[in-house]
């Protein structure tokens, strides 16, 4: 009698394992890892003008086609607030012309010779 029991139990076990294999298709997936994220460089922009940057402002900025505080800040490596004040000063002196005034962004362009007259 014992050999018959072994045969039945061994016959049942393969069926159980087969069912487990079929059902495990939609089981646990690998856990997603967190990405490190992008690291930005620290901007070390000037807070005040030095003589060289101030001269560069008067020489180069009026020649730009599109002048915004962000463009000036990036090219001259100065803070955005300083760039805003510098552009207001250039506008008052007539070196650049204001195109659009938005509540958060001001756009200027170079003053053409026809505008100065």
UniProtKB/Swiss-Prot annotation:
GO biological process: cytoplasmic translation
A GO MF term: structural constituent of ribosome
One Pfam family named in its UniProt record: Ribosomal_S25
Region (Disordered): 1-38
Biased composition (Basic residues): 28-37
GO CC aspect terms: cytosolic ribosome; cytosolic small ribosomal subunit
Keyword list, A-Z: Ribonucleoprotein, Ribosomal protein
Domain of life according to the entry: Eukaryota
PANTHER family according to UniProt: 40S RIBOSOMAL PROTEIN S25
Annotated family: Belongs to the eukaryotic ribosomal protein eS25 family.
Protein name (database record): Small ribosomal subunit protein eS25
Taxonomic source organism: Drosophila melanogaster (Fruit fly)
Taxonomic placement: Eukaryota, Metazoa, Ecdysozoa, Arthropoda, Hexapoda
